[in-house]
Amino acid sequence: MATMILRDTHRALEQKMKELEKQKKETSIKIREAASHGDLKENGEYHAAREEQSFIVRKTQTLQTHSPFQIVEYSEIETDEVGFGNKVSIYDEVKEETKEYYLLGPIEFELDTFPMVVTYHSPFGQAIIG
């Protein structure tokens, strides 16, 4: 099943993937340079670069696990009932306050493109849909 994603977020994702690829290449250079300094056991620069590379690879893999995508235009978002792309206001009776959430997908959550994102796959997201 395709992961729903807003067109703007898809563009941001493509940009982020390019940025991560660039960082990965730069980190590979850092690793080679640090390795050329000798003993890797006590080479902090080498270990820091390897850790950075691991982070970049994990982030890339996390973003890729959500493909394929179903790109959604803002004009396609339904507003007559709660669903993907909606901004939802929920009143907390205990705290006596209203919080606003955006019901979006995991990529919007991962890229932190919106404040207060709830993914439509999450239990909370599923509870408020419809």
Model-based region annotation:
Residues 23, 34, 63-70, 127:
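Conserved, well-folded catalytic cores of nucleic-acid-processing
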Residues 74-130:
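Non-DNA-binding regulatory cores of transcription-related proteins
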Residues 22, 48, 57-58, 63, ...:
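General N-terminal targeting signals
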Residues 11-12, 25-26, 66-69, 79-83, ...:
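A short linear-motif detector with a strong N-terminal bias
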Residues 30, 65-66, 117-118:
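Short, charged/polar low-complexity linear motifs in solvent-exposed/disordered segments
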Residues 44-76, 80:
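Internal alpha/beta loop-helix hairpins
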Residues 1-58:
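N-terminal cationic and glycine-rich segments that engage phosphates or anionic surfaces
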